[in-house]
A protein has these predicted regions:
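Iron-sulfur cluster-binding electron-transfer modules in prokaryotic oxidoreductases
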Residues: 1-253
């Protein structure tokens, strides 16, 4: 870990916020929670106007020309900014980091721009722990368990950040999640193409969440949250899956 003096000198003070489609259209409260937490940590949050979808749904569906068009727009918006690009979605972050450069193979100028932007992408929890070196930034006591999203943990290789922040909440108990590494069954278009398999995976994940004894299951992707809470509601149960930012934005007992 860096010394406190060097950490203070190098820690980012301004970030660009990549809001994602789900938060922009369905969960603006989670976006607001992200801003609350970042500002509490002493970071100014800028939201570049004109940002749209990163193109992941089109890419996953095989519509590469359409995905490339959306990626060009994304790069045009964010390449003109400076500083880290923070996003509350490991899935969308992974799209930019791992798939944008390949989308522009044969287009050196766009590929170079994609690689430059990709180097600036930071997932929300990752930024708090790895860049700001925080261990506590907010949250209330409770029994939590954590479901690591596939793209965040496997493609980005980000592990332990959310757990660190949850464990740092005074009075919080972090319960282990059985089969934590197993997918929740969403997988974007996977849930549409193979709904029966997706539903079975979701049910197993819900059973494991219940077995953890936690009051709240925390995720870092709104897509996982939507999928799991949708399953709970269809079973007549109360939603209990929440985004990490929502948890950290709360302060006090």
């Amino acid at each position: 870990m860096r010394s406190s003096a060097s950490a203070t000198a190098t820690r980012p003070t301004v970030v660009q916020f990549f809001i994602t489609c789900l938060l922009d259209h369905l969960y603006p409260d989670i976006a607001e929670a992200c801003v609350t937490v970042l500002e509490r940590a002493g970071v100014r949050v800028e939201v570049p106007p004109g940002q749209t979808c990163c193109g992941q749904p089109a890419f996953n569906g095989g519509f590469l020309a359409e995905a490339r068009q959306m990626a060009r727009h994304f790069l045009a918006v964010f390449a003109e900014t400076t500083g880290p690009i923070v996003t509350p979605s490991g899935s969308c972050a992974s799209m930019v980091v791992h798939h944008y450069p390949g989308l522009f193979a044969g287009e050196p100028a766009h590929q170079a721009r994609a690689e430059a932007v990709a180097r600036r992408i930071r997932e929300f929890g990752q930024f708090l722990v790895e860049d700001l070196e925080l261990r506590y930034v907010g949250g209330r006591p409770g029994r939590y368990t954590y479901h690591p999203g596939c793209h965040l943990s496997r493609e980005l290789g980000v592990r332990g950040c959310a757990e660190t922040l949850l464990a740092g909440i005074p009075g919080a108990e972090l319960r282990p999640l059985p089969e934590a590494e197993a997918c929740c069954g969403f997988g974007g278009l996977f849930a549409v193409k193979l709904p029966t398999v997706s539903a079975a995976m979701m049910q197993r994940k819900l059973e494991n969440i219940a077995a953890s004894g936690a009051e709240t299951c925390v995720v870092c992707d709104a897509s996982c949250m939507t999928h799991l809470n949708g399953g709970l509601v269809r079973q007549g149960r109360a939603p209990m899956v929440r985004h990490l930012a929502e948890i950290l934005a709360e302060v006090g007992p």
